[in-house]
């Protein structure tokens, strides 16, 4: 691991932080930030080397996302989400890889994967329509991975349902402006996308189940450890890394603010044992959340690198660990922010923005614990979870 991208982020830290304020104002990642991210190759970290990528260890990717998010939450969020898409494109049809990366390896892809569209088969491909929310960083992307349900030729959904990941160029979808008016992660520009009767050739479509269970990468023939990693470990990694990084940024700004503060009782925070205890506990919890997430990806990497099978139980435990890491970090900042006093609520203080952005990150579907914890517990008890309990695992 070389951490080249991380070092370059550190060298531009002051500018990246300042641009986070601009992102909040304009409702998307600032153009200057996107230019910096492209210049240092932040989105190429998980991209194949044959297409100008770095094939970085996912731990290095996660740590780099954390740092970006600690400075500029919206940029870190986009880094974590858009930065995972090259990992999946690495085992899509070589023809679409060439279309996207052939002339510019810094081409970005948006999402989301949620099935907001319908694919109706036609000659050599599909007729594709739908609407999707939450397309993070979409203003800076030229292609998108969009989730859809497979239909028959009459437009009726296949039974049992079959989900697809559709790869589509910017010319075939519309970004709906003013569709991202939210209280947190405002600077991500996670706007709605609309597709109307676009033609999608077969080679630009991936079967969702095959992506998640590893069939797609095996069919492609990839042998690199990076691309053999489970989807359930890689896809959530950037999102949770960004969330933890935002919490680290919140803690940094809280410490800076509290260092010279006198509380309402006239006591310096440095002399207040109760606040100091809360800060200490929160610091330990955020560090533990970080270390847990990184150890989780290391553990999975070592297993895959050794050629061992990753069972459903192990995938479920990995997801359980990832979800809990996010919640632990969020709970920690909730012990810090209320102890920063009334002035910490002011909009000219970064504390409130980091707090809002961290909580918005917690709302992502990948951080919902219910079915993940349920499936992990059943697996440990020797049962085989079925149906919705297997979703995103």
From Swiss-Prot:
Record-level GO BP terms: fatty acid beta-oxidation using acyl-CoA dehydrogenase
A GO term from the CC aspect: cytoplasm
Stated role: Involved in pigment production acting as a hydroxylase that transforms indole to indoxyl, resulting in the formation of indigo.
E.C. numbers: 1.-.-.-
Protein name: Pigment production hydroxylase
UniProt-listed InterPro entries: Acyl-CoA_dehydrogenase (IPR050741), Acyl-CoA_DH_C (IPR013107), Acyl-CoA_Oxase/DH_mid-dom_sf (IPR046373), AcylCo_DH-like_C (IPR036250), AcylCoA_DH/ox_N_sf (IPR037069), AcylCoA_DH/oxidase_NM_dom_sf (IPR009100)
GO molecular function: acyl-CoA dehydrogenase activity; flavin adenine dinucleotide binding; oxidoreductase activity, acting on paired donors, with incorporation or reduction of molecular oxygen, reduced flavin or flavoprotein as one donor, and incorporation of one atom of oxygen; pigment binding
Keyword annotations: Oxidoreductase, Pigment
Enzyme class per UniProt: oxidoreductase
PANTHER family: FLAVIN-DEPENDENT MONOOXYGENASE, OXYGENASE SUBUNIT HSAA, MEDIUM-CHAIN SPECIFIC ACYL-COA DEHYDROGENASE, MITOCHONDRIAL-RELATED
């Amino acid at each position: 691991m070389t951490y080249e991208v991380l070092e370059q982020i550190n060298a531009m830290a002051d500018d990246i932080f300042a641009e986070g304020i601009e992102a909040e104002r304009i409702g998307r990642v600032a153009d200057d930030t996107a230019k910096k991210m492209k210049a240092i190759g932040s989105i190429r970290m998980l991209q194949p080397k044959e297409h100008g990528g770095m094939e970085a260890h996912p731990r290095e990717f996660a740590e780099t996302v954390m740092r970006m998010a600690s400075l500029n939450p919206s940029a870190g969020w986009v880094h974590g989400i858009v930065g995972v898409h090259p990992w999946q494109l690495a085992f899509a049809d070589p023809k679409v890889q060439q279309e996207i990366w052939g002339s510019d390896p810094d081409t970005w892809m948006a999402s989301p994967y949620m099935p907001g569209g319908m694919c109706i088969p036609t000659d050599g491909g599909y007729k594709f329509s739908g609407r999707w929310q939450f397309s993070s960083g979409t203003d800076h992307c030229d292609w998108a991975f969009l989730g859809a349900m497979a239909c028959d030729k009459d437009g009726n959904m296949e039974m049992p349902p079959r989900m697809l990941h559709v790869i589509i160029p910017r010319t075939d979808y519309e970004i709906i402006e003013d569709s991202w008016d939210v209280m947190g992660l405002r600077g991500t520009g996670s706007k709605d996308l609309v597709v109307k009767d676009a033609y999608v050739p077969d080679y630009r479509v991936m079967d969702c189940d095959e992506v998640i269970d590893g069939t797609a990468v095996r069919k492609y023939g990839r042998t690199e450890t990076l691309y053999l990693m489970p989807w359930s470990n890689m896809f959530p990694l950037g999102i949770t890394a960004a969330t933890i990084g935002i919490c680290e940024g919140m803690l940094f700004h809280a410490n800076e603010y509290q260092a010279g503060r006198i509380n309402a009782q006239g006591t310096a925070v440095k002399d207040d044992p109760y606040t100091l205890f809360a800060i200490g506990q929160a610091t330990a919890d955020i560090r533990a959340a970080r270390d847990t997430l990184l150890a989780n990806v290391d553990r999975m990497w070592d297993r895959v690198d050794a050629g061992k099978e990753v069972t459903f139980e192990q995938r479920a435990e990995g997801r359980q660990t990832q979800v809990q890491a996010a919640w632990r970090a969020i709970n920690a900042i909730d012990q810090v922010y209320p102890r920063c006093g009334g002035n910490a609520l002011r909009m000219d203080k970064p504390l409130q923005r980091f707090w809002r952005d961290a909580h918005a990150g917690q709302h992502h579907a990948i951080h919902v614990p219910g079915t993940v914890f349920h499936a992990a517990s059943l697996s440990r008890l020797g049962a085989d979870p079925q149906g919705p309990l297997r979703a995103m695992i």
